[in-house]
């Protein structure tokens, strides 16, 4: 199977740039996997490989595509029928699109990790807790507030990337100094994760009113389970944090939500922990960080699951099997 990549439009150093897909790329003239947003945006890729009998795309942006431009929605929904299989990280969009299009094109997929970047030996936990990401919702503010009295790290691309309500001068003056690392390379981030007991996260997208209206303009939008709580302006999004934390032995402390998408790939209680209310976070961080020996096995279980079930090799094999169906 040939693998064609184009990362135009991606972040500077996302985890998928470290997959090294080309080590698995063998052109048989029959099957091809497209990876990267640029493969959708640049028509030359489809034109050059249209003669292949079996074509797949790995879609990492669902459900974000559904509040973008209609042109991009069409590409992301495979409206031209170019791809035989689309492996997507949004299981709800997969089910919805298959029902709407009356095909079996879309396949729920995990986010893998390149085992060549694994560190087999455990490292000393010198940090209590970490959050990496932006501030786009009061929940993220609460994450930072909850961590600040501990030995914490807050990794961000910078306040310039935060949602508009959190870019006011007053807010930036108060919270930007809490950033401990800005726009760090992936390898450096993984090193920090390995030295950290807890990673707090929410597998949600927080929408603006205009984004909600765009989604509601899509015919049949209400049949997508991902849109079941638009009244709260939230969508489920399976981010890369879970696999990156699991592969680096940091305990996932996940905010419970209406979908709990993390349970598709990891088991609650044995491989990660939930918290229900933001105000519970400080006490949970205190409990786990002070009694790490009672909780370390959870991070270790997640590490075993990630390194056995969610490797890049396994993903490539799943794509090939899917194209053979």
List PLM regions with ranges:
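Nucleotide-sugar donor-binding catalytic core of glycosyltransferases
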Residues: 1-29, 34-47, 60-265
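Conserved acidic donor-binding segment of nucleotide-sugar-dependent glycosyltransferases
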Residues: 239, 272-278, 287-292
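Acidic, glycine-centered active-site loop in nucleotide-sugar glycosyltransferases
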Residues: 261-272, 284
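Short beta-strand/loop segments at the ligand-binding rim of alpha/beta enzyme cores
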Residues: 51-59
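A charged, aromatic-enriched C-terminal amphipathic alpha-helix characteristic of glycosyltransferases
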Residues: 290-321
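Short, contiguous hydrophobic alpha-helices characteristic of membrane insertion segments
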Residues: 252-253, 270-276, 318-325
């Amino acid at each position: 199977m040939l693998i064609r990549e184009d990362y135009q439009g991606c972040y500077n150093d996302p985890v998928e740039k470290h997959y090294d897909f080309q080590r698995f790329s063998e052109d048989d003239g029959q099957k091809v996997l497209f990876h990267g947003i640029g493969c959708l945006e640049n028509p030359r890729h489809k034109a050059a490989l249209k003669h292949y009998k079996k074509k797949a795309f790995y879609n990492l942006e669902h459900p974000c595509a559904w509040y973008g431009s209609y042109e991009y929605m069409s590409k992301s929904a495979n409206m031209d029928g170019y791809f035989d299989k689309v492996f997507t990280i949004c299981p709800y969009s997969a089910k919805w699109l298959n029902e709407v299009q009356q095909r079996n094109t879309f396949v729920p997929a995990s986010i893998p990790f390149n085992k060549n970047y694994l560190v087999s030996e455990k490292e000393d936990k010198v940090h209590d807790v970490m959050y990496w990401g932006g501030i786009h919702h009061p929940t993220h503010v609460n994450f930072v507030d909850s961590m600040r009295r501990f030995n914490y790290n807050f990794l961000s691309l910078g306040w310039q990337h935060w949602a508009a309500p959190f870019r006011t001068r007053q807010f930036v003056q108060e919270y930007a100094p809490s950033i401990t690392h800005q726009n760090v390379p992936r390898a450096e981030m993984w090193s920090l994760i390995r030295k950290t007991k807890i990673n707090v996260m929410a597998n949600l997208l927080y929408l603006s009113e205009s984004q909600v209206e765009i989604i509601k303009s899509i015919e049949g939008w209400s049949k997508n389970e991902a849109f079941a709580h638009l009244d709260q302006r939230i969508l489920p999004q399976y981010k890369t944090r879970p696999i990156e934390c699991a592969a680096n032995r940091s305990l996932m402390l996940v905010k419970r939500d209406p979908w709990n998408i993390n349970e598709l790939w990891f088991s609650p209680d044995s491989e990660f922990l939930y918290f229900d209310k933001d105000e519970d976070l400080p006490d949970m961080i205190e409990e786990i960080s002070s009694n790490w020996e009672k909780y370390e096995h959870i991070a270790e279980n997640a590490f075993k699951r990630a390194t056995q079930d969610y490797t890049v090799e396994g993903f490539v094999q799943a794509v090939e099997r899917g194209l053979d169906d």
